[in-house]
Amino acid sequence: MSIRFIYGRAGSGKTYFCLEEIKHKLNDGANHPLILLVPEQFTFEAEKYLLDMIERDEKMRAQVLSFKTLANRVFVEVGGLARQHMKACGKSMVIYKVLEENKEKLKVYSKASRQQGFVKKISEAITEFKRFDVTPFQLIDASEKIEKLGLKEKLEDLALIYSSFEEVLHKNYIDEEDELDLLSKKLEKSLQFEGAEFWIDGFTGFTPKQYKVIEKLLKKASRVSVTLTLDPSIDSIDPTHLFYTTKKTEEKLIKICETNGISVEEPVNLNKGIPKRFEHNKELAFLEKNFFSHPYEIYNEETKNISIFKATNMYSEVEEVARDIARLIRDEHMRYSDIVVATKDLKRYYKLVKAIFSHYGIPHFIDLKINITNNPIIVYVISIFEIYLKNWSYESVFRYLKTGFTGIDKEEINLLENYVLANGIKGNKWKERWEYRIDYKTDSLLMEEREKQIINKVNEVRERVYLPLEKFYTRFSHSKNVKEACEVLYDFLVENKLPEKIEKFIEEFKNRGEFDTANQYAQIWDIVVDVLDQMVEVLGEEKISLEQFARLISIGFDEYQIASIPPALDEVLVTSVDRMKSHNSKVLYLLGANDGVFPASSFEEGIFSDEERNLLSSLDLELDRDTKAKVFEEQFLVYTALTSASEFLKISYPIADHEGRSLRPSIIISRLRRIFPKIKVSTNIVEMDTDEENLNRVTVPLPTFNEMIKSFKKWNITGKIHPIWLEVYKWYRTKDEWKKKLEDTLEGFVYDNQIKRIPPLKIKKLYGEEMEFSVSRLEKYAACPFAYFVQYGLKAKERKIYGFEPPDLGIFMHNVLNEIAKALEKEELTWQEIDKEWCNDAVDIIVEEMVDKIPGYILKSSSRYRYLANRLKRVLSKAVWIISEHMKRSSFVPLGHEVAFGENQKYPPIKIVLSNGEEIKLIGRIDRVDVLEKEGETYVRIIDYKSGDKTLDLSDVLYGLELQLLVYLDAILESAFEGKANLSPAGIFYFKIDDPIVRADKDISDEELYKEIMKRLRLEGFVLKSLDIIREMDKLIEGTSYVIPASINKDGTIGKNTKGLTEEQFEILRKFVKKKSKKLAEEMLQGDISILPYKKEKETACQYCPYSSICKFETNFKGNDYRRIESKEEKLWSIFEEEVKEDGSQVDGRTEGSDNNEG
């Protein structure tokens, strides 16, 4: 019985020495067991090395074991497997059960027990206690010695949780940590390792339980050899030293030997000369010797085997690695298996490496286990419970449906989703048949056949979603315990053919070459069943609610991770520096060498803070290292990484993260640059157009093709290109498989997103043959022809979301005001005769009736919307009262409300004859027309209600953006209504429907408040510049009017603040608007669909346009620019007058004729 230490710095050949010794022992005929004991994650690699060195028939005598496989061997021999092994999933479930049962007794963790991730935190704490041989009794004992209340109560809580967990666990099970306890006991009875020889390799340190097992092995074995990464020539080692941990490991093993009378042999020191790994590479040998030396030497020669790459971001960093790997394979004749790519943060790099390496055709294995919680199969199972717990919320239902496992196809899901979103369906509404209207013809009260068909289809899909789930919830509610609940869920999954659907997906993935995804799906069903089995085993007879079940199954799934397909013979290994253990890699790419990342500068403290750990340590309660010690141990990780390759070390770091935030280089970079002043540092921050740089970008066909296109784009802008890309182009042109892609891509250089015209015959089919247009449609065309085409030609619609949006608000308010006008007529009242009380009562009744008569109407769907309905009542009451006040001060009287002009309406449409002889009709609906009879003349004013701020700007009229009021005026003036021939314009106005908030620094009187409200809600637009008409519109005017945008000076003249037009100006604008309408209609019907949005100061047509993703409008793109709107009034009038003068057309009745001289 003896122990022997094998010392050696990194690369000195410690593993090789062990394997060589085993080989020689076998050759010498050794008949006792020869065991290489390594960490669990390195067993596969160690077995491979061993097999390469020995004959296969000798494998039985020489074996590679980990502590886990060693335990299994002993248990098979002497027993110990009577109790079942509890998996991490079952362990978490027991902890959840313990927390639930003891939540009233817990002091610190009574509320935290239900927090996300808390079960995992407690699980890690219990694991730590067991690994370091800490019992619940020791926790209680420590708590009694501590005065600090927070830590005292924390220890008491943890002791209670831990002891309760152990009680449940040890009834029928053991967990992974118990195995080592059991192993150390059972080793005494084991005979298979009597006289065996052990080589323990690859460990930096051991847990207290592993030390106990080693102690037993030392008593059984003839010799135990332990490799230590250590330099025995270093005398004093403090906690900050690189080899501190391994030195402490040696001391503990020596102490065990002294206690048990086991001899310590003369150590083997491999630290002689150049380390074996670097015997042909003096740069890496120099690095190993000096990187952590104080003082260090400087390497003054050219550095060829170590390099640094400074990348703009993570993507370009990984792409540079991919390019360099392609070069090594092509030019240096390396094998992929010679290369390792490592990083401290593999989760952050995983997707990038996977995508870019696949793009470059680099075979690779990513040594990372992936959480399964986002896998569609798991999402499907979890969503079954979420739907119930979240009351059939939109998110939970469609998360479930979009997994692809419900048997409902995508088209049906889209139909259902649009309907649910448009109508805000959730909760009990899923139980009922749906009859909510679909917005085809909103003015039709009768449901059309097409609408009925869609609603029937929606309800058929609804039943296929609702009925199976409702049946499941009913059956689940009758289950008496966890076992029965698991059976109900399993039956539901099988009845809905989940295993068969998974198999179908696996086949599809394999056919597409997505073997990694196929491998993941293949494991998931077994995991689902395993979690259910664990629940039955651990909590089978426990009563459980659906909410608890959902939480438990989620906790179970959280414990599972899926590994990728095991590596092939020739693949690049992509791994984390924490798991890196490759003795035969020639090249290491070390990614993400950023400050604070590698080496890490901080760690999470866990259940105990560093201060608490140190306090417990002073009470002889030894736990894992504190974060400070872990930071020092990062040095050893850096050392291991930097010395793992035998030929090339390539370190890289990005200067910015994916959000553009700057990142600093790691201390590793600065230290390398000091030790190797001539080290090559390359970057892609500024692309160099050198022969070498361009040649490096030529790698494998697909990425090289993309690089060529990038060069062509620059050529297109700068007129310069490196000759190499012309040669590359010739290569692709000669390859049949690349010809089509090359042609299609080059066509993109002359791509223009502008589609100028569509043939008139096609455009008519798209817009409709009736040639009838509302004025608002012309205005939309003027704002941007392409947006108009998408909306009215392609009939594109935004998905309707259940809500009360500005358009809904506007329609609702208009309808209420129209109903008010009807109520006045019915009660034979005028606007002048009503008071505030009548306004409030009438609005209240009308709003309630409108809300009640529409099934599922949004304004009664929730307390929030009922509050909005009440607010609307206040706003509309104020609007009705203000209109009444306007009327009381005015001589004008309403001619009509909601006055329609068009075919079969009271007033005919405005007909415009186009240049080609075709006729279009302008139609519309005027909110209110007021008239005044005066001295044989009838004056007309047009009023349009608006729910938001709206001004009438003549520049908008010039560009066709504001035609409505003038066309409405023209419709009435040209109608010769009721035989009246002498019709004149009095004004065109917008009226804002609002209930303004008046803020004042001091108390104000009712009169002042009234005036302020009237001022804010006066009409906005243009009035006839006539003193008589202004006084008829506001009979009480003194100075500035509270009704219209006008003022009268003290001398009785019209004030300069009046927004007025003369009769001649009204006539000019009417003629201009007709001409503009004709021009817009002609452009529209000739198929002009140019992408030409307007811009007026900061406002553009694109601001709220839903079609920007279709047109791709960008001002820096060829042919893309705004139509800019001038707003100087003096200029505008000269343009209006010029346009009207050029137009020699005559107005005949209501028809606008054509003229060949029109510009």
Curated annotation (Swiss-Prot):
**EC class:** hydrolase
Q: Name one GO biological process term.
A: double-strand break repair via homologous recombination
Cofactor remark from the record: Binds 1 [4Fe-4S] cluster.
Ranges in coiled-coil conformation: none
Gene3D superfamilies from the UniProt entry: 3.90.320.10, 6.10.140.1030, P-loop containing nucleotide triphosphate hydrolases
| E.C. code | 3.1.-.-
Which cofactors are required for activity? Mg(2+); [4Fe-4S] cluster
Q: Say which family it is in.
A: Belongs to the helicase family. AddB/RexB type 1 subfamily.
- What job does the chain carry out? The heterodimer acts as both an ATP-dependent DNA helicase and an ATP-dependent, dual-direction single-stranded exonuclease. Recognizes the chi site generating a DNA molecule suitable for the initiation of homologous recombination. The AddB subunit has 5' -> 3' nuclease activity but not helicase activity.
Tell me, how does this one assemble? Heterodimer of AddA and AddB.
Q: What is this protein called?
A: ATP-dependent helicase/deoxyribonuclease subunit B
Organism per entry = Caldanaerobacter subterraneus subsp. tengcongensis (strain DSM 15242 / JCM 11007 / NBRC 100824 / MB4)
What lineage is this protein's organism placed in?
Answer: Bacteria, Bacillati, Bacillota, Clostridia, Thermoanaerobacterales
Q: What gene, per UniProt, encodes this protein?
A: addB
